[in-house]
Regions:
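C-terminal and inter-domain tail/linker signature
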Residues: 2-144
Length: 144
């Protein structure tokens, strides 16, 4: 009986400590949108993140599989080089377990489109991110 009470208490405490996965993803978008990249990279991005941006490497500046926080930061940092006034605003999210899919409005100078972003959240951090962007519209809006 005591063991069940301890397990129940642990489950309650775990729920209070861990944010809902959609809240974690929303917080990431909020931090990114406000420009608080220090908190975004420091608190939301897992050290062992894998970010997959489909596309042919060399043709799109973000294309590839980027493993680890340093590679994630290096590649995310390219965004202002190529797109002025880049913003992503979630329109809807669905989740199952630790997985979240966000339908996102993507805007920049010369760009107004929709993206899809897939996340796997671990310990209130992005562990996996896969980006499904309108690469043609984004490419056409790039500073070249």
């Amino acid at each position: 009986m005591f063991l069940k009470q301890v397990q129940h208490l642990a489950a309650i405490l775990n729920q209070e400590v861990n944010m809902d996965v959609k809240e974690v993803v929303q917080r990431g978008y909020d931090l990114f949108g406000s420009g608080d990249m220090e908190t975004f990279f420091g608190e939301i991005v897992h050290d062992d993140i894998t970010w997959t941006f489909p596309g042919e490497e060399g043709k799109h500046p973000l294309a590839g599989v980027h493993k680890g926080k340093e590679n994630f930061i290096a590649n995310m940092s390219k965004i202002p080089e190529y797109w002025d006034n880049f913003m992503v605003t979630p329109q809807a999210m669905i989740s199952e377990g630790n997985k979240v899919f966000a339908l996102v409005k993507g805007t920049a100078d010369g760009m107004d489109t929709m993206f899809g972003h897939y996340f796997e959240v671990e310990n209130n951090q992005f562990k996996v991110m896969m980006t499904f962007d309108d690469t043609l519209t984004a490419f056409n809006a790039m500073k070249k």
